[in-house]
Swiss-Prot record:
This is Ribosomal RNA large subunit methyltransferase H. Belongs to the RNA methyltransferase RlmH family. Keywords: Cytoplasm, Methyltransferase, rRNA processing, S-adenosyl-L-methionine, Transferase. GO terms for cellular component: cytoplasm.
Length: 156
C-alpha cells in the first residue's frame, strides 16, 4: 500500500524536509509514504485567491491516481485519536487501494479537492502552519502503523 501525501508548497525549511524524511524512511516497504509537492500559486497584495485555489486544486487532483482513496485534511473533518487513525489505516489496507491525503496551502483546500475526498480528517482544532502539518501527518501515520503492528514506538 502507498500513502501519498499531496501538499501545496515546494520550498520548505530544512527542518520540515528532515522531519518528514525521518518518518518516511521508518515505514516498511509494503507501506510506503510518498510526498507530492504542488507549487503554491503566487500570492500578493491583489491576488485572486479563488483563482489560485482553483489552480492548486486542479494540480492536486491531477496528481492522484484514479483508484486512490482520497482524504482531505480540513478543519470541518473528523478528529481521530491515535487508535482511531490506526483503525482507519487498517481499513484502508483492507480496502486494497492506495490513499492520497491532501494538505492545502495558506488558504486551505480548493472546493474541488474537498468534494473529491471520501473522508475528511481534522488534524487539530488549532490553525497549524501547513509545513508543520507534513511532519505531524507523517509521524501520526507512522504511529498508527506501529499500533497496528505491535511495534514499540507507540506507548499507551
Amino acid at each position: 500500500m502507498k500513502l501519498q501525501l499531496i501538499a501545496v508548497g515546494t520550498r520548505m525549511p530544512d527542518w520540515v524536509t528532515t522531519g518528514f524524511q525521518e518518518y518516511q524512511r521508518r515505514f516498511p516497504r509494503d507501506m510506503a509514504l510518498e510526498l507530492v509537492e504542488i507549487p503554491a500559486g503566487k500570492r500578493g497584495k491583489n491576488a485572486d485567491i479563488a483563482r489560485i485555489l482553483h489552480k492548486e486544486g486542479e494540480q492536486m487532483l491531477a496528481a492522484i491516481p484514479k483508484s486512490n482513496h482520497i482524504v482531505s485534511l480540513d478543519l470541518p473533518g473528523k478528529t481521530w485519536t491515535t487508535p482511531d487513525l490506526a483503525t482507519q489505516l487498517g481499513k484502508w489496507q483492507l480496502d486494497g487501494r492506495d490513499v492520497s491525503l491532501l494538505i492545502g496551502g495558506p488558504e486551505g483546500l480548493a472546493p474541488a479537492c474537498k468534494q473529491a475526498a471520501s473522508q475528511s480528517w481534522c488534524l487539530s482544532a488549532l490553525t497549524l502552519p501547513h509545513p508543520l502539518v507534513r511532519v505531524v501527518v507523517a509521524e501520526s501515520l507512522y504511529r498508527a502503523w506501529s499500533v497496528n503492528n505491535n511495534h514499540p514506538y507507540h506507548r499507551e
